[in-house]
A protein has these predicted regions:
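Short alpha-helical scaffolding segments that buttress acidic/His motifs in well-ordered protein cores
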Residues: 83, 278, 282, 335-336
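A diffuse structural propensity rather than consistent per-protein peaks
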Residues: 35, 129, 153, 168, ...
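Exposed alpha-helical structural elements
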Residues: 38, 156, 248-252, 273, ...
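Amphipathic alpha-helical interaction segments
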Residues: 90, 117, 144, 190, ...
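Conserved AAA+ ATPase small/helical "lid" subdomain
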Residues: 77, 250, 256-329
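C-terminal engagement/docking regions of AAA+ P-loop ATPases
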Residues: 320-382
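AAA+ P-loop NTPase catalytic core and its hallmark functional loops
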Residues: 2-264, 269
Length: 382
């Protein structure tokens, strides 16, 4: 794990997953490695309480007798519960929302908790082919022996069907409509026909118990294809909203930025007040209104929590690897300008208007941090 830039959840939280598999002896949905309530606990955490392993787990259960489960998703518990129940049935789960609202993270966590792996993944792009959702061929074996089962190269979806696990399809709406529709028969019939192997009897791959699909899609993104009505009917839709609480968003940004710096063997030396200011700016520009009630012109860029984490981590990296007497607050305008203007250069004007309005008003209110930020306005024009 030490050599991984971004360990998957089944590696990062291996101790928690192993503990939860034996913590609850209740009924498990077919194919689940733990109970549905344990899956919810894995995502939402145990609220700081140390869960105790029951005596009924027996001596075969290894690991600690009690464990605090860390919260991984900051959001609606009801959304997580509905998602888990969807996956316990025979309908796919489609997570939709603005970019950066943790849809991919939720799908990873759910797949890891339910199936033990989040690796059975297809990344949707305009170049994704039907083979990547169904199967391909080992052409050396195909030429040597002709069509036979050993020559099939299964897609992550077919691998999940065979093993009764959860497959993930990221940004499904980036796939072309004809490619998306390859999922219709898989999700409705729970089987996949391989006509190349069909002789007198058809060759059909049947989905094992526990198989399901989690797909994600961005609501505000360019270069996407509309899903067919037939495919939409095969999914239960869950909309993942941005984090409602500024305090919770700040805590999440700090935790994620800290984790990123730990992987770089560095320490996050950014004051909580600076992190709060970063999150406040992101929320103001994302929502189009400040907590004080001031109207703000929203940029075309989605000011997501993921982008806020990136800015906080970049400032932390700069402080760790380019140490100087300069206040890290002086780095904030430059990184903000990079985020705001990446989709439309005209958004720089909107950021400057925010500085001349909201930031100036806060500075006039004798808030020292905002006074310093207002004095750094010139950096936004560079």
């Amino acid at each position: 794990m030490s050599n991984m830039q971004s360990p998957p959840p089944e590696v990062l939280f291996a101790d928690e997953l192993a503990f939860l598999e034996t913590w609850d002896a209740g009924t498990r949905p077919k194919g689940f490695r733990m109970t549905a309530s344990s899956v919810v606990t894995f995502l939402m955490g145990s609220r700081g309480e140390a869960l105790k392993r029951p005596k009924s787990a027996g001596k075969k259960a290894s690991g600690p007798e009690s464990l605090v489960i860390s919260p991984k998703f900051v959001g609606s518990r009801a959304l997580v519960e509905r998602s888990v129940i969807t996956l316990a049935g025979e309908r796919g789960l489609l997570l939709v929302g603005e970019p950066g609202t943790a849809k991919s993270m939720i799908s990873e966590l759910l797949a890891a908790a339910i199936s033990g792996t989040s690796a059975l993944t297809v990344q949707g792009t305009a170049g994704t082919t039907e083979d990547q959702l169904r199967y391909g061929w080992n052409y050396a074996l195909l030429l040597a022996k002709g069509p036979h089962p050993e020559a099939i190269v299964p897609s992550p979806v077919l691998t999940a069907m065979r093993s009764g696990r959860v497959a993930r399809i990221e940004e499904v709406t980036r796939c072309l409509p004809e490619v998306q529709d390859a999922l219709v028969s898989i999700l409705s019939d729970r089987r996949l026909s391989v006509p190349e192997l069909s002789g007198s009897d058809p060759h059909i791959e049947h989905a094992g118990l526990g198989f399901n699909v989690i797909a994600t899609a961005n609501l505000r993104d360019r270069g996407v294809s509309e899903m067919s009505a037939a495919l939409k009917r095969r999914f239960n839709f869950e909309t993942v909203p941005p984090i409602a609480s500024a305090r919770e968003e700040t805590a999440l940004v700090k935790a994620r930025a800290t984790r990123m710096l730990e992987r770089a063997e560095a320490e996050l030396k950014v004051d909580d007040a600076v992190l709060e200011a970063i999150v406040t700016v992101f929320r103001d520009l994302r929502l189009g209104r400040t907590e004080e009630g001031y109207a703000v012109e929203k940029p075309s860029t989605v000011m997501s929590t993921a982008e806020a984490v990136s800015v906080a981590a970049s400032i932390g990296m700069s402080a760790a690897f380019l140490p100087s007497d300069r206040d890290v607050l002086g780095l904030v305008p430059g990184y903000l300008a990079g985020v705001v203007t990446k989709d439309d250069p005209k958004d720089r004007g909107r950021l400057l208007a925010y500085w001349d309005g909201v930031v100036k008003k806060r500075a006039e209110g004798k808030q020292r941090l905002w006074q310093t930020l207002h004095e750094l306005r010139a950096q936004l024009e560079e």
